[in-house]
Amino acid sequence: MSTPSPFGHDLQREEPPYTILKAPVTADPSAPRRYPWAWQKYLDACANHWMPQEISMERDIALWKSPHGLSEDERRIVKRNLGFFTTADSLAANNIVLGTYRQIRAPECRQYLIRQAFEEAIHTHSYQYIVESLGLDEGEVFNAYREIPSIRDKDAFLLPHIEVLAAPRFQTGTPETDAALLRSLIVFAAMMEGLFFYVGFAQILALWRQNKMVGAAEQYQYILRDESMHCNFGIDLANQIKIENPHLWNPDFQAEILQLMRTAVDLECAYATDTMPRGVLGLNANQMHKYVIYIANRRCAQLDLPEIHPGTPNPFPWMSEMLDLKKEKNFFETRVTEYRTGGGLNWD
C-alpha cells in the first residue's frame, strides 16, 4: 500500500505478513482466498451433507431385541462405542467453537471450521438416534466417560488441549502460545479424530460386514467419511502453520509430538482390549493393537515425522477402502429419503 509523499513519489508501506495466524479477520465473502485447499475442503464437506433420521434403524432394532441376535461381546462393543463417541464428538465441537476458531484468522479456514462444528453436532445427534432407537439405558451410555476407565483416560488426555485454547485470556502471538495452538491442532486432528476413533470404526464396520447393525454401521460410514476430512484438514492446517512459522517445528517440539502420539497409541490399545477382551467378529485385541500402530504411523507420515513402529502392516486391509476418500462408495445411494435442502420448512 502506498502513502502520498511531499517529495513527488509514493512511499511503500510494507504490509504485515498474511498467515493463518495473522490474517485480517473479515466478514467479506469476496475477500481473497490465500488457502484454496481450505475452501475446497469446505465445498467437499457441504457436498457430503447427511442427517441421521434419513437412515432406517428397523433391522437394528429387531436384531437388538432378539435374545439370539447379538452375543454379549458384540453388545459390549456397541455400548462401549456409543459411550465413547457421544462424549468425543462433543469435545471436538467444544475445541472448535471455544478454542480453535478464535485463533485461526484466515476466513476460508474459519469457514471450514464452522462446517466441521456443525458436522460434530450431527455426529452427536447420530449417536443419540442410535441409543434411542435401540432403547439403551441413556444414563449408562452417556456417563461412560465417568465410569469406564478406558474412555475416561482418553478424554483426560484430550481435555488439557481444549482448556488451554478456551482460556479467556489465551491469544496467539508469542512462541509459547503459537506452539500451544499448533500442539492442540495436532492432538485433535492426528490423535483424536485421526486415531482415537478408528478402533470403534473397525469394530462397528466388522459387524456390518456380517450383516449386523446395518443402520448404525451406515451412519458410522458417513461419520468415518466426515472424520477423515476433519483429520486431513486439521493436519493440513498444522502443516501450513509449520511452513509459516518454522521456528515452532523444532526438534524439541517434534519429540514432544512423538511422545504424545505414543501415549495416544497406548490409550487406544487399552480401549481396544477393554472393548473386546475376547476375540469376536474375526477380530481380537492383538490385531487391533497392530491396527492402531498402523494408523499412528500414517498420521506421523502426514506430519513429516518418523513412524513410531516402522513397517507395521495393516491387519485389516478391508478397512483401506473406507479410509481412502477417493475409493469410498457413494453411501448416499442408500438413504431412506431423498435429501432436500430446506424441504422440511413451512413458511406459512
Language model regions located:
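Non-heme di-metal
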Residues: S2-D348
